[in-house]
Each structure stands twice: as C-alpha cells, then as structure tokens.
Amino acid sequence: MSASWADVADSENTGSGSSNQNSHPSRPAYVPPHLRNRPAASEPVAPLPANDRVGYGGPPSGSRWAPGGSGVGVGGGGGYRADAGRPGSGSGYGGRGGGGWNNRSGGWDRREREVNPFENDDSEPEPAFTEQDNTVINFDAYEDIPIETSGDNVPPPVNTFAEIDLGEALNLNIRRCKYVKPTPVQRHAIPILLEGRDLMACAQTGSGKTAAFCFPIISGIMKDQHVQRPRGSRTVYPLAVILSPTRELASQIHDEAKKFSYQTGVKVVVAYGGTPINQQLRELERGVDILVATPGRLNDLLERARVSMQMIRFLALDEADRMLDMGFEPQIRKIVEQMDMPPRGVRQTLLFSATFPREIQRLAADFLANYIFLAVGRVGSSTDLIVQRVEFVLDSDKRSHLMDLLHAQRENGIQGKQALTLVFVETKRGADSLENWLCINGFPATSIHGDRTQQEREVALKAFKSGRTPILVATDVAARGLDIPHVAHVVNFDLPNDIDDYVHRIGRTGRAGKSGLATAFFNDGNTSLARPLAELMQEANQEVPEWLTRYASRSSFGGGKNRRSGGRFGGRDFRREGSFGSGRGGYGGGGGGYGGGGGYGGGGGYGGGGGYGGGYGGASSGGYGGEPPSAWD
C-alpha cells in the first residue's frame, strides 16, 4: 500500500528535526520540566513544535536570543514565559518589551500571544492547517451538483477567491489553508453575504459551509474594526454570534474561525456548557468579536449580563433545524427576540443546515428579512458517492454481524487512520456496552454520548480522528456537524426513527466528493422507516433489497417526521409555493417528490456509479485509502 500523506509528512518532520540537531550541535533540545530526569523511553518522544510548548516563549525559529525583540509568533521572541513578564519590561525572562507585531509599548495585547501556525511553513506541515484535515476535496464530484437560488436580486456566483474582496490578511490565510477554489456553497453564499443580504442555505456538512459564513463575517468585522463599544463594565459586546446545537460543533466552528482570523485582529471566543464557566468568562473579558456558542450557555451569559447582543451585526445559526428539533426554539427566540439583539434588517442573519423542512422554514423566516434561499445538492449524504447497504439483522445477531464486517475490513487491509468506522446506536448505555464488547474482542474502540463529560468527549474524538481507536460508537450527539475526516464506513447498528437523522448519519462518510460506505441493520422494529429508506436509496441509484421493497409496500407513509422535503436538496423555498400544501416535487421536478405521484422527479436523482467493488477492499471509485489530504470539510 502506498504511503499516505500523513506518513510522508511524518517522515519529513523527522528529517527536519535531525537536520536541525546537526546544524546546532552545541544546543541541546529543549526538554519540558515535567519530562526532565526521567529514564529514556524505548522510543524517542517527538518534540512538540515551538509554538505548542506550554509556557515556553523562547526565540522564534532562526532568531538569536535578544532582549525583548519584536518577534511575531511567540510573545516578542524573548523569555521563558510569554505571558508572565511585566508589561514594558524591555528584556529578561518573560518580557515582551514593547515588541510584538503591533508595536505597542506596554500593556497586554492578546494578539502577541497568538500562535503562528505558518511559522515553519517552508520546512514542515502546519498542524493547524494541514494535519487537521487529511482529505483532498474531489472537485470533479462537484461539477454536476444541482444548485438553486431564489429571492430578489440574487448576486451572481464567483469562480475563484481572487474575485472576492475579503481583505489581504484573510486572503493570505485562505492561501495558507491551500484552498484552491470555492466549493459550490461558497461560490454562491459568499457573494450573497458580502452584499449584506440575509441567507437561508441548505447544504450539508462537508460542503465547506463553515468557511462560507466565516469568511464574510471576518471580512465584515475587519473592515469596521474600530467600532466604538461601551466600556467600564464587565459586559462584553461581540459583533457576531454563531449558534450551534452541540458543544462539539461549537468547538469545531471556533477552531475554524480562529484559523481563518489569524493575524486579522478579529478575536474569536467559544462558550458552551459542560465546562467551567469561569474560564470562558476570563476569555470573554480579554475581548471578543465573534462569539461561537450553544444556546443554553449563551442564555446563561446573557442572564448574568456578561454578554450583550446590543452591537451584533451578524447572527449565524448552523444546523438550524437540529437546534429546533432538539428543543432549543424557546432559547433561540429569547436570544433573538427578547434580549437587546438588533432587529432583523439591522443585523444580518444567516441560517445554514443540511435540511430545511417547511415547518422549520416558517419558524426561521421570523428571523430573516428579504432573504435569499440557497439550496445545494446533497454532496456526500445520499448520492452515488456513498454506497448504501441495508441488511436484515435481528437484535440478537447485531454484535456478531458487526464483528463480521470489522473482520472483513481487517482482512482486506483496511484499517487505521485512513479508514475509520463510525457505529451509531440509539442509547447511551448501548454505546458504553458495545464499546466495551468491541475492546474485549480485539477491536480498539471509544464512544461519545450525552453522559460523557466534555473532556471525555474531546479525548474520544481526538483518539478516533488520529486512528488510535479507529472505531467510534456514538449516539446522535455525533450525527450532526462534526468534522471527522477519513470516515470510510458508517454502520447504523440501531437505525434512527427519523429519515433525516439517517441522512445526517451516513453523511459522516463520502465527504468532500470522496467515496464512502454506509451499512444499516434493519429488522421488524424499523418498519416505519422502510418506505422513506427505500425511496432514499432509489433516489441515489442504490440497489434496494427485495425484502425492503416488500416492507415499504406494507408500511404506511403518513406525514410526521419521516416525510423528507426537498428531495435531492433537503429543502426548498416555500415562498415559491402558493401554500404549504404537500405532494409537490423538489427543484428538479417532473412531478416527483414524496407522496406526489411517482417517486422522485428529475430522472431518478443522482445517477449511480463507483462503489466498493463488491467488498470492503478494492474500491473502484476511490476506495478507503491512498487519497491525499485537505482542510475543506
């Protein structure tokens, strides 16, 4: 098997490290205090990059020891503690000496502590910008994606980032991120948002929607950074707030926004429950322009009068339908309508999600003014990029059947970081039990669910993404929005009750135009899902088992939450309809749509192709491994 991109990067890092040691034989490698005087390990411990050394403010790469200095990356280039010196001390241990890239004299400036992920760009990969997402977007898969826009005076799309005036610093970060050209949602959404228009965008995770709303927000704040905000109190006044349904998604958006806002002067802070609020309060007191938060924690901060919505210019809701489905509607309405938030039309409001059923659109329309509706075809959620398999498995046989699948992957050499397996279950107890059973049977696994502390969830996700535990057992807490690259196989151990939840689950694989595999265990307890599941598979030109077709013909397909709206788009603009009546097709029409006389319109959806060659190995459309990396998800 050819070496992966990560393997090549590791070998380059090793080579770079040896070269540096040879060129400076008289200077021993820095050893953190907690590792000193310990016996040598059997394998050498890879040194951390300079910017990751906790409490180490030593000289930037290639510089000399100098008093104070004016380094850009690590607190002015002098001292062992970049955050502990006296302001304006001039030199010595910890002094920033009036240096720093903004040339201020004295005082404390948050930007001086900003880690520079690009400092060693010429010699080694940047962890924050390259190793984080080891997938390269397959642009060929985006060429034929259906896109629909509706609304008044829709700005034309762009084809390159060079056509967009985002500001020099942000454009530099985009180039450093190695973003080649905009994804479809970015091509359309960014010009709309730069025009100051409200937007409702229907696009699933993996399509680049985080960058689609982060770029215009950061650019807008950069152009008006000197706005006067009230002073003299402990209340902070962010200019933008981004709401997300889960802690994990909030943390992910925060990390992306921090990456995009590097050296722009835009300060990004995250706030979510499950962690001590005091630490988040201290971060807020240091200044905030963009606040990424979950609805519950933001309400808490508003009630404590530690955050005010008075100066908000941008309001973004990511996974908006999920937040409403999870019961956050009262909290969201309180934030938007009852606090000191500027009214719609004064602020700019952005709603992004993978699905926008008509009921959700009614509620969301209360937050928007003269908005543009953007629908981007499903990329990586229910297309030919994902091979969907449904197998009839009794509850008592599920574990042994899962073991057969995992053994088949292992025998075909499909394992490790490039082929992660995500297993969805319905209950927290079931997640813990299955994780333990897999570990006992020789398959390293971890799990996340609502009863895990935030720290436990973050540790589990990190272990899964790195490939140390290539199997993650999860409840729906991980189904929406999480950025987990390399998921090659999604197993619905327990099928959800909602077909949209199924769509979101399998959307964890086949991301960024790459191939993926989704396996579902179906039995008599899932009969209500039979018909929408069969129709969903038909839409993507998947093979529907005969037994599932029989179940589908027997099951009743009423309204409820298993009625998917919008067909291949996951949602449509209800303003195009005379009413909220049912039985009409999506954008691609032909009289299709669920319950509307004749299956999916537009010639049967996405057209098949690819697949995994009939087994878990030997993929004929990309396969599990061997593909280089990207930061687009």
UniProtKB/Swiss-Prot annotation:
Disulfide bridge map: none
EC number(s) recorded for this UniProt protein: 3.6.4.13
Domain Helicase ATP-binding, residue spans: 190-374
An MF annotation (GO) of this entry: ATP hydrolysis activity
Keywords: Acetylation, ATP-binding, Helicase, Hydrolase, Nucleotide-binding, RNA-binding
Annotated Gly residues bias: 68-80, 87-101, 580-600
Classification of source organism: Eukaryota, Viridiplantae, Streptophyta, Embryophyta, Tracheophyta
Entry's free-text remark on domains: The Q motif is unique to and characteristic of the DEAD box family of RNA helicases and controls ATP binding and hydrolysis.
Organism name: Arabidopsis thaliana (Mouse-ear cress)
UniProt biased composition (Polar residues): 11-25
Catalyses which reaction(s): ATP + H2O = ADP + phosphate + H(+)
Listed CDD domains: DEADc_DDX3_DDX4, SF2_C_DEAD
PANTHER family (UniProt xref): ATP-DEPENDENT RNA HELICASE DBP3
Motif DEAD box in this chain: 318-321
Positions of ATP binding: A203, Q204, T205, G206, S207, G208, K209, T210
Name this protein carries in UniProt: DEAD-box ATP-dependent RNA helicase 37
Family from the record: Belongs to the DEAD box helicase family. DDX3/DED1 subfamily.
